[in-house]
Amino acid sequence: VEIACLDLEGVLIPEIWVAFAEKTGIDELKRTTRDEPDYNILMRYRLDILNKNNLGLIEIQEVINTLSPLDGAKDFLDWLRERFQVVILSDTFYDFAQPLMRQLGYPALLCHQLHVGEDNKLIGYKLRQANPKRQAIVGFKSMYYRTIAAGDSY
């Protein structure tokens, strides 16, 4: 069995934080891991901006619900699934990805978890593990799966 691992944002779907930044007019939220490779620094930065602007999960999900997979993404994923076991490895959050996973036919997804307060505000997050994309590939290889990976983080 061969496993194909794909990044999600910028590969199969639009960048969620960029779409949210454009909708809200808050350009600071356009920063991605390409701009700030330390994910913890990037997320603390994002959470601070959200709190300063009194924005939470509901507002982000409203924007996500307007998004669609990139042109050809679903067809490509269907083609790939006929040939490989497909796993999406992403630095996004389950609360963000779910509506888009539905549109992509629910591929296996490994990502992070948000901590949301009762007031809808994002109060933190839990990384699946340190260096999660690389560690997933290492894990698959340790189980003797032939693994390929594609995206801006591999």
Feature-to-residue mapping (PLM):
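Conserved Lys-Pro-Asp/Glu-containing loop-to-beta segment of HAD-superfamily phosphomonoesterases
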Residues: 128-154
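Short glycine-rich loop/turn motifs that provide flexible caps or phosphate-binding loops at active sites
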Residues: 9, 123, 150
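Short, charged, surface-exposed secondary-structure boundary motifs
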Residues: 117-125
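A short glycine-/small-residue-rich loop at the edge of a beta-strand within enzyme catalytic domains
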Residues: 64, 124, 128
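Alpha-helical substrate-recognition element adjacent to the catalytic core
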Residues: 2-118
